Amino acid sequence: MDEQKRDEILERIANALERMAPPEKKIDNLDGSEGFIYEAKTGLIRPINIINRISLGLLQGIVPQKKILYDNTINFSNDLPANNALLWGARGTGKSSLVKSVHEEVLLNTKSKYLKLVEIHREDISDLPELLSLLSKYKKYKFILLCDDLSFDAGENTYKSLKAALDGGIEGKPNNVIFYATSNRRHLMPRDMMENERSTAINPSESVEEKVSLSDRFGLWVGFHNISQDTYLDIVNAYVKKFNIPINKKSLRAEALEWSITRGARSGRVAWQFVQDIAGKSKTKIF
């Protein structure tokens, strides 16, 4: 066997061994970023240069929710007891925005460099136990683990990974990690799925209880609801003032209401989309 052939065989063997026992996962550049995204396919925790968020003061109509989540997060940052939180409710009402804004506010108020925001996608939730194990190794840091739009459909068993991770098993949940999830469903399961379980299970009450109890793993339930017209207009006005968008007050009100009617909803998201529209028309930069 010539030397080149031997080297090719050895390289293939090395590659095969690496696939069987991949290198230990780690987080690069922890000090260089405030936010990260977990990528299941590569196993990397990728740093985000700029987190897409707005200041906490711009979030209107959710005063109780802001206080609850801020107090819980500041406790976590200060090594005090804190709960995992489920932010549930209507679409576009500021659930994920609140998590990101609270993270920023806590960083500003504590001057901490060690509180990091890590997002895990809903479809990667089965990797949660492994991710928690990885984060637990970085004891100098604290991690807010965010899963946006979390829910489970019929036939899915990944919710069991979430239950196990939140309970912590015999190892316990890492003290340096807190889990925040947003969802449109209070119990994370569609009602028809739970009703179907009730009708087909050998022991209906136990089967449904297992799924409903998933939300019980969150010590905090923070509800978000559809907003009033006045609150919707307050949100619009706050953005317009913040970004100095030139527009007549009467025109602003009329156009904002027309926008919400055409969208069939009033929410923080709809307000933001309207503001982006009028900012573009007036050639006003908002970032």
Explain the meaning of each model-derived region.
Residues 183, 199-212, 219-233:
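Conserved AAA+ ATPase "SRH/arginine-finger" region at the nucleotide-binding site
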Residues 4-5, 44-68:
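Dynamic helix-loop-helix/coil hinge segments at AAA+ ATPase domain boundaries and subdomain interfaces
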Residues 64-78:
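Pre-Walker A adenine-sensing motif
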Residues 79-101:
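Walker A/P-loop nucleotide-binding motif
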Residues 105-143, 150-155:
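AAA+/P-loop NTPase substrate/partner-engagement loops
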